UniProtKB/Swiss-Prot annotation:
Originating organism: Hypnale hypnale (Merrem's hump-nosed viper)
Alphabetized UniProt keyword annotations: Electron transport, Membrane, Mitochondrion, NAD, Respiratory chain, Translocase, Transmembrane, Transmembrane helix, Transport, Ubiquinone
Gene that specifies this protein: MT-ND4
Protein name per Swiss-Prot or TrEMBL: NADH-ubiquinone oxidoreductase chain 4
Record PANTHER family: NADH-UBIQUINONE OXIDOREDUCTASE CHAIN 4
Pfam families membership: Proton_antipo_M
Membrane topology, from the record: Multi-pass membrane protein
Localization in the cell: Mitochondrion membrane
Family membership: Belongs to the complex I subunit 4 family.
């Protein structure tokens, strides 16, 4: 069910991040060198989750692994225990909560019309539902953290934190962000471009679907314009 996926990605996964933030506060702040293995594992896990996204043929699986990769960055930033790291982690959890929920919503919009989640079978939607293509583009741009969105602000804070802590981490961070951009564009092009593979009668997009997307994107853009509300 799509509602379960949206709640899981937007709220429950972030509750785990909140739990990590509360737990880290009781750890010694001066001994961050002890946490090197955990930070390396978090960054490596984010990179592996991104690589797994590139291999997915199922749309919902791709979005789910995308959420996991972003949580790897959150964990790495939280463990360092700097003010910028905590602010970036909080901002990324909020921003990605909106983004991943919107992506699941769009995936369901596609599934209701094609009755399949296989990427190659859902192509050609820019000719059929041009407004939905606009939502896909906006949401994917947010997913790859383009400015001036909240995703960009949060990832910039996390990158600054990790680079100040250890400049070598920029290698894994850069690789992770490059792969994120690759699979996001792959997802957009696979679902929207080309000619439709299946011969089916497609009903037009409904007002409720546009309203759902507006309720995801407008709050995120408003928070992006005034990030001090959450940072």
């Amino acid at each position: 069910p799509i509602a379960g996926s949206m709640v899981l990605a937007a709220i429950l996964l972030k509750l785990g991040g909140y739990g990590i933030i509360r737990m880290v506060q009781i750890l010694p702040t001066t001994k961050t060198d002890l946490f090197i293995p955990f930070i390396v594992l978090a960054l490596w896990g984010a990179t592996l989750a991104n690589l797994t996204c590139l291999q997915q043929t199922d749309l919902k699986s791709l979005i789910a692994y995308s959420s996991i990769s972003h949580m790897g960055l959150v964990v790495a930033a939280v463990i360092i225990q700097s003010p910028w790291g905590l602010s970036g982690a909080m901002a990324l959890m909020i921003a990605h909560g909106f983004t991943s929920s919107a992506l699941f919503c769009l995936a369901n919009t596609t599934y209701e019309r094609t009755h399949t989640r296989i990427l190659i079978l859902t192509r050609g939607f820019h000719n059929i539902l041009p407004m939905a293509t606009t939502w896909w583009l906006l949401t994917n741009l947010m997913n790859i953290a383009t400015p001036p969105t909240m995703n960009f602000t949060s990832e910039l804070l996390i990158v600054s934190t990790l680079f100040n802590w250890c400049p070598t981490t920029i290698i894994m961070l850069g690789l992770s962000m490059l792969i994120t951009t690759t699979y996001s564009l792959h997802m957009f092009l696979s679902t929207q471009m080309g000619s439709p593979m299946l011969n089916y009668q497609t009903e037009p997009s409904h007002s409720r679907e546009h309203l759902l997307m507006i309720l995801h994107i407008i709050p995120l853009l408003m928070i992006s314009m005034k990030p001090e509300l959450v940072i």
